[in-house]
């Protein structure tokens, strides 16, 4: 390992890739908004299901596009069980 490599600047590829993914998601949202919402809903449910049992019928995901901002709203009803504290 060279000492010069240790102090070299990190590449910007990961940051550029993340920005491109956000841009592509935003572009796709304008064309197929309902498809994106459905995919996001399933992915969010999969992540939450790892930690809490959730009734899939009680999950509502909506996306609203304004002139300058797009809002993603996720409404999930999580049942209270013994041993689970409210936030």
UniProtKB/Swiss-Prot annotation:
<protein>
    <recommendedName>
        <fullName>Cell division topological specificity factor</fullName>
    </recommendedName>
</protein>
<dbReference type="InterPro" id="IPR005527">
    <property type="entry name" value="MinE"/>
</dbReference>
<keyword id="KW-0132">Cell division</keyword>
<dbReference type="GO" id="GO:0032955">
    <property type="term" value="P:regulation of division septum assembly"/>
</dbReference>
<dbReference type="InterPro" id="IPR036707">
    <property type="entry name" value="MinE_sf"/>
</dbReference>
<dbReference type="Pfam" id="PF03776">
    <property type="entry name" value="MinE"/>
</dbReference>
<dbReference type="GO" id="GO:0051301">
    <property type="term" value="P:cell division"/>
</dbReference>
<comment type="similarity">
    <text>Belongs to the MinE family.</text>
</comment>
<keyword id="KW-0131">Cell cycle</keyword>
<keyword id="KW-0614">Plasmid</keyword>
<comment type="function">
    <text>Prevents the cell division inhibition by proteins MinC and MinD at internal division sites while permitting inhibition at polar sites. This ensures cell division at the proper site by restricting the formation of a division septum at the midpoint of the long axis of the cell.</text>
</comment>
């Amino acid at each position: 390992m060279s000492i010069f490599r240790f102090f070299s600047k990190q590449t910007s590829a990961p940051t550029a890739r993340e920005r491109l993914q956000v841009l592509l998601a935003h572009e796709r949202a304008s064309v197929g908004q309902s498809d994106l919402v459905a995919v996001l809903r399933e992915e969010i449910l999969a992540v939450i299901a790892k930690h809490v049992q959730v009734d899939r019928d009680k999950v509502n995901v909506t996306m609203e596009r304004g002139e300058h901002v797009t809002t993603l709203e996720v409404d999930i009803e999580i049942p209270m069980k013994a041993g689970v504290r409210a936030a």
